[in-house]
Regions:
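Conserved short hydrophobic patches within well-ordered secondary structure
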Residues: 1, 24-25, 178, 184
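Extended hydrophobic secondary-structure segments that form protein cores and membrane-embedded regions
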Residues: 15-18, 149
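Conserved AMP-binding/adenylation subdomain of ANL enzymes
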Residues: 3-14, 21-124, 128-135
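Short, well-ordered beta-strand segments
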Residues: 14-16, 224-225
């Protein structure tokens, strides 16, 4: 399976990985993806403690000025808190203008795939104006070159997805697991819907089945079943778990 089928970068892009490097998500979505594009990779310096490493993240962002970052929802929430604390410190007038700009952009973006439209055409000039007046300065705190985040590891709530898209740094949610090396699907600029996990990587087959292995009708819950070269060969020296997981 090819992560580049859902994670699109340019040769001149720099990716900052702020996730543990001993996990296959950082390897595949980070190192191997950027190697495929001929791009550059940066990591956060490890501190003497976990807290020291976290404090190195904003320093690394300022130094690297990344185009893309691998992140998790917990860090994204902290980024938002930091941004809004900075806005609040500028006074009530700036905060009120910021909130108006944010709500206008969220309304314009709708569910991302259907953003804009004739009903929201009047919002577009305001989106561009406030992007230059407010959100451009916000993005400067992330180096001024950020295109998007790739988020994983936990559910990314829709409010956060709407927020980062509104300020011009979309955080695209993906889904996967280590047994699938590890990307199954992801949103991207080419195809995103807030609240979804995006398109599956190519080449890979996916279906949603019931307990008996039958494909469930659209709209019904079931188990995600995948098939492809990205699926693991099995668990190390654990044939019982392998037999229970690898069905076909």
């Amino acid at each position: 399976a090819l992560p580049i089928s859902v994670i699109h970068c340019d040769m001149d892009d720099v990716m900052l990985i702020i996730l543990p490097l001993d996990h296959c998500f950082a390897h595949v979505a980070g190192f191997y993806t950027m190697m495929s594009y001929g791009g550059s990779i940066a990591t956060v310096p490890v501190g003497k403690t976990a807290m020291a490493t976290l404090k190195n993240i904003p320093i690394a962002i300022r130094e690297v000025r990344p185009h893309v970052m691998l992140s998790v929802p917990a860090l994204a929430r902290n980024f938002r808190k930091s941004i809004e604390a900075g806005i609040k410190a500028k006074g009530p007038k700036v905060e009120k203008l910021y909130n108006f700009a944010l709500n206008n952009a969220i309304a314009y973006n709708r569910e991302y795939w259907n953003r804009g439209g004739w009903q929201n055409a009047w919002r577009y000039p305001l989106v561009k104006l406030f992007d230059r007046l407010i959100f451009k300065a916000v993005r400067e705190n992330f180096g001024g070159r950020m295109k998007f985040f790739v988020g994983g590891g936990a559910l990314l709530d829709i409010a956060l997805q709407r927020y980062f898209c509104a300020i011009g740094m979309p955080m695209f949610q993906g889904y996967g697991l280590s047994e699938a090396t590890p990307i199954i699907c992801s949103n991207s600029f080419e195809g995103a819907i807030f609240g979804s996990s995006g398109r599956i990587v190519s080449p890979m087959e996916l279906k949603i089945c019931d307990a008996e292995g039958n494909i469930v009708p659209d709209g019904e819950r079931g188990e995600i079943v995948i098939k492809g070269e990205n699926v693991m060969a099995g668990y190390w020296k654990n044939p019982e778990s392998t037999a229970a997981t690898i069905v076909d």
